[in-house]
């Protein structure tokens, strides 16, 4: 009897749990419908109807979004108390971040510095950072710390917005500002060829430094004349000015720059770094100008261990163009240790060894690279006839970890926006959350997005998390039926089609590029109309281009005829 009672109770519990789960799911569906209704009312500025809907959405993850829309619709007339209340409750959201940023600009314009300080959180905007510093300086809050923060913003070769001028004025009139700092910013500005910035800073120099600055500015404007009439004695600053002129001259008169270098390097004590900088720039200028002797200048750079991606990339590219394997081998020897471990440089080093008769050593490197799931790993595998390695290792996590991510407010908001087809809001909510998640949380989120069919977020988030071995997330076989049908119809390789889709749209079926290309395979409207005419019908609008089957079939057909 007891056993029967236990079975009945167990069965009832299962039924109850199933019914509860169904009711909760049904409740969420009803909430989405009510939220859509509220959005329509918000678009019509019917805020009374919005409030009525909101009363039914108290535990819905996006209920706050209706408050946000109401506030933004009448921002200038919204009380500070209402804004503060929203930020206190929903400040940790994409909308909260946007509202905070908008309010900070308004408060700065009104010079409401104490309220500005109250709501400020770290911002990327230099303007808002400068306003923050100004607010602290005016109110006397942590004055010295504020001045040092201003110094960090000020010390750059770039121009800064006028919003920074009040804070900079405090800096110029403080003990934090020194002649050494002024000279350093002039150096940074001249290095970037920002003459106007350097001249503006130079106005704050005492008279004894003005001549130094004037020499540099004159050299910048007319390097050839200045180099012909250079009279400064040998100091570090004089050598800086000379090198600036030589770099400027090399762009327009390469031979004259070389001649002046040969003259001045015998009379001035340039250090190793200055030698390196001169030859590095000369080499890059020679390549840009397409000079026939560019390989000579690339080889002349004293580049051992130099961390300069552009130089190394240019050297390898030129060596490959000229099939100069000996030069390529020498270039590899100059790489910093971390770059020598790069799959790309290792592969080309092995190719150079192979061409120079060192096949045994080359094979060792190719075999090592062939074990990797990487473009150069696959190229290496081809060299030694080894199979490609996919190395699919899905992100591992517990059920509890997965549930914690799924129930996190960041993810709940993004998911609801996604289900409502509000993709811009969904991506914004997702991006906000991913910036704040750890790498492991991001990797779990990527798998979650993949499970939902939100393929592009899965791809981008897995890459951000460094989950490179989670292959089915990074390379999903999405829209398989449509893509396979199109590939068969147009006699196009299926793998090639998937590669194009992933590269062009990351499986975003409604994506539109800056150039106007649409859909999975990024079809231009003009091309689509041409294809449509050839097939005997016209396109009323671009909506048909976004249809997955149409987009895939037409683009595959175009490539098939190429």
Question: Which residues does each predicted region cover?
Answer:
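Catalytic glycan-binding domains that act on GlcNAc-containing polysaccharides
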Residues: 59, 68, 259, 263, ...
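Alpha-helical adaptor scaffolds
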Residues: 70-72, 84-88, 100-105, 279-290, ...
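Residue-level signature for tetratricopeptide repeat
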Residues: 40, 69, 73, 106, ...
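Structural motif corresponding to the intra-repeat A-B loop/turn of tetratricopeptide repeats
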Residues: 44, 73, 77, 106, ...
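Alpha-helical repeat scaffolds
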Residues: 48-53, 78-89, 112-122, 143-155, ...
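Bacterial N-terminal signal peptides that target proteins for export
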Residues: 1-9
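Bacterial N-terminal signal peptides
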Residues: 8-17
């Amino acid at each position: 009897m007891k056993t029967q009672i236990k079975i009945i109770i167990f069965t009832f519990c299962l039924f109850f749990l199933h019914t509860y789960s169904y009711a909760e799911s049904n409740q969420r569906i009803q909430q989405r419908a009510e939220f859509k209704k509220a959005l329509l009312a918000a678009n019509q500025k019917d805020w009374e109807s919005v409030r009525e809907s909101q009363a039914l959405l108290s535990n819905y993850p996006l209920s706050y979004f209706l408050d946000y829309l109401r506030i933004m619709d009448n921002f200038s007339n919204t009380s500070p108390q209402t804004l503060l209340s929203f930020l206190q409750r929903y400040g940790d959201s994409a909308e909260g971040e946007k509202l905070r940023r908008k309010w900070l600009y308004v408060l700065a314009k009104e010079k409401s510095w104490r309220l500005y300080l109250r709501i400020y959180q770290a911002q990327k905007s230099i303007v808002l950072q400068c306003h923050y510093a100004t607010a602290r300086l005016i109110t006397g809050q942590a004055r010295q710390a504020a001045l040092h923060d201003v110094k960090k913003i000020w010390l750059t070769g770039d121009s800064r917005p006028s919003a920074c001028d009040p804070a900079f004025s405090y800096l110029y009139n403080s003990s934090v500002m020194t002649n050494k700092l002024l000279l350093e910013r002039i150096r940074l500005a001249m290095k970037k060829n920002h003459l106007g910035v350097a001249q503006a800073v130079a106005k704050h120099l005492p008279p004894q430094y003005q001549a130094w600055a004037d020499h540099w500015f004159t050299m910048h404007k007319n390097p050839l004349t200045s180099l012909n009439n250079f009279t400064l004695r040998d100091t570090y600053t004089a050598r800086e000015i000379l090198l600036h002129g030589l770099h400027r001259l090399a762009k327009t008169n390469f031979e004259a720059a070389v001649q002046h270098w040969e003259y001045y390097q015998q009379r001035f004590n340039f250090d190793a770094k200055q030698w390196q900088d001169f030859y590095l720039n000369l080499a890059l200028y020679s390549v840009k100008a397409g000079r026939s002797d560019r390989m000579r200048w690339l080889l002349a750079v004293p580049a051992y261990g130099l961390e300069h991606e552009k130089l190394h990339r240019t050297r390898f590219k030129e060596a490959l163009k000229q099939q100069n394997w000996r030069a390529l081998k020498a270039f590899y020897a100059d790489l910093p240790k971390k770059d020598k471990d790069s799959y790309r440089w290792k592969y080309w080093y092995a190719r150079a060894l192979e061409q120079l008769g060192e096949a045994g050593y080359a094979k060792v490197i190719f075999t090592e690279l062939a074990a990797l799931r990487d473009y150069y790993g696959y190229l290496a595998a081809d060299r030694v006839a080894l199979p490609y390695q996919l190395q699919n290792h899905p992100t591992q996590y517990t059920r509890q970890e997965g549930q914690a991510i799924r129930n996190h407010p960041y993810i709940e908001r993004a998911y609801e926006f996604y289900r409502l087809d509000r993709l811009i809001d969904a991506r914004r909510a997702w991006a906000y959350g991913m910036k704040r998640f750890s790498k492991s949380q991001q990797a779990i989120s990527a798998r979650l997005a993949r499970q939902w069919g939100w393929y592009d977020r899965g791809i981008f988030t897995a890459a951000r998390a460094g989950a490179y071995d989670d292959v089915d997330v990074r390379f999903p076989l999405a829209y398989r039926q449509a893509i396979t049908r199109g590939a068969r119809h147009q006699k196009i390789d299926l793998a090639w089609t998937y590669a194009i889709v992933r590269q062009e749209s990351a499986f975003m079926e409604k994506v539109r590029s800056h150039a106007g290309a649409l859909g999975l395979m990024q079809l231009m409207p003009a091309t689509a109309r041409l294809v449509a005419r050839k097939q005997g019908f016209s396109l009323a609008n671009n909506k048909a281009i976004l249809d997955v089957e149409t987009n895939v079939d037409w683009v595959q057909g175009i490539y098939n005829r190429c």
